[in-house]
């Protein structure tokens, strides 16, 4: 069993798509090991996306991520990182396969409904950014 981090971004939260997106993850066989809604500060968003600090889209990404609340989840399941990324779809919703979350709910490459960890190593880092071990139910050891 693996764990991965998923974030329902401000665009999807603001359009009341939380339940639909959570249902997609559950129907795909993921177990939600932790979940909370937070409104990120600029400092928190900058810290979370620090890997992108030198990229031209960094400030736009931070501004978007602090524009409203987000739902942060730890998803658990077999091959969780890869499966989550398949379910999310391509970063650009126009290139995302039909039936994926981004194809259904994303608007643009910057406003694309969800975030998901891109590797097991990053999943562990990202999960610990938002959750303590005691907040994760039946966590993978």
UniProtKB/Swiss-Prot annotation:
GO terms for cellular component: cytoplasm. PANTHER family: NUCLEOSIDE DIPHOSPHATE KINASE. It is an enzyme of class 2 (transferase). The keyword Kinase applies. The keyword Membrane does not apply. ATP binds at residues 9, 57, 85, 91, 102, 112. It is found in: Cytoplasm. One of its GO terms (biological process) is GTP biosynthetic process. Belongs to the NDK family. This is Nucleoside diphosphate kinase. It comes from Chlamydia felis (strain Fe/C-56). Its EC number is 2.7.4.6. Major role in the synthesis of nucleoside triphosphates other than ATP. The ATP gamma phosphate is transferred to the NDP beta phosphate via a ping-pong mechanism, using a phosphorylated active-site intermediate.
């Amino acid at each position: 069993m693996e764990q991965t981090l998923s974030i329902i971004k401000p665009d999807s939260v603001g359009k009341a798509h939380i339940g639909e997106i959570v249902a997609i993850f559950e129907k795909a066989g993921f177990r939600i090991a932790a979940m909370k809604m937070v409104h990120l500060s600029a400092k928190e968003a900058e810290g979370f996306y620090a890997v992108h600090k030198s990229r031209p889209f960094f400030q736009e990404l931070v501004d978007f991520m602090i524009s409203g609340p987000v739902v942060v989840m730890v998803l658990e399941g077999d091959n969780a990182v890869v499966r989550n990324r398949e379910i999310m779809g391509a970063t650009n919703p126009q290139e995302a396969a039909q039936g994926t979350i981004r194809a259904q709910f994303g608007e643009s490459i910057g406003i694309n409904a969800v975030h998901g960890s891109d590797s097991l190593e990053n999943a562990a880092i990202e999960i610990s950014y938002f959750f303590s071990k005691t907040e994760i139910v039946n966590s993978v050891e």
